[in-house]
């Protein structure tokens, strides 16, 4: 997005009023930890952390193939092609939540199944994560806005399968 005043740009994956933060910046991360710990010092016992998987991006800014008629590519491709989010999440946990034994729920929507133990449970980045398995059933060719019809049996099997897969490590929030 172009900023008229300085002829500079900033990245926002959501609303233009919500610029993405550069988690590669050590000073920024330390300030975030300071703010989180301030709340935990006040007695807050947990955090819901939305869109946390988006903190790591491919800052090489590759030119992705367009995936829409407007000639643009979806911003999630920038997150999918990034590596190293686990290191940032572990640093976040160790500098904040772990010190207070705080309960955390992470919004993690593109995790690979084999990564589940890294994300939840005793040694995971979070206490639990939201379960997006049923939401994935409603993604049509162009995302959630052209969702196909879902029958109850498919939905039930998907939820049950996700919970059975997760029980070895912890649980998922719904």
Predicted regions mapped to residue ranges:
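Short, small-residue-biased leader/transition segments that mark boundaries at the very start
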Residues: 1-5
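Mixed-charge, polar/low-complexity N-terminal
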Residues: 8-9, 13-14, 83-84, 140, ...
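N-terminal small/glycine-rich loop or linker at the start of catalytic domains
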Residues: 6-24
């Amino acid at each position: 997005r172009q900023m008229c005043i300085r002829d500079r740009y900033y990245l926002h994956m959501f609303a233009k009023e919500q610029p993405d933060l550069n988690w590669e910046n050590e000073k920024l991360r330390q300030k975030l930890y300071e703010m989180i710990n301030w709340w935990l010092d006040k007695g807050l016992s947990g955090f819901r952390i939305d869109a946390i998987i988006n903190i790591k991006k491919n800052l090489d800014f590759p030119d992705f193939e367009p995936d829409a008629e407007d000639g643009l590519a979806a911003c999630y491709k920038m997150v999918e092609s990034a590596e190293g989010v686990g290191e940032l999440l572990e640093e976040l946990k160790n500098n904040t939540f772990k010190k207070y034994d705080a309960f955390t729920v992470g919004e993690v929507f593109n995790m690979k199944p084999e990564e589940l133990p890294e994300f939840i449970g005793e040694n995971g980045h979070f206490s639990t994560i939201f379960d997006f398995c049923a939401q994935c059933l409603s993604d049509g060719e162009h995302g959630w806005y052209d969702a196909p019809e879902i029958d109850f049996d498919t939905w039930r099997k998907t939820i049950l399968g996700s919970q059975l897969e997760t029980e070895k490590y912890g649980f998922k929030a719904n």
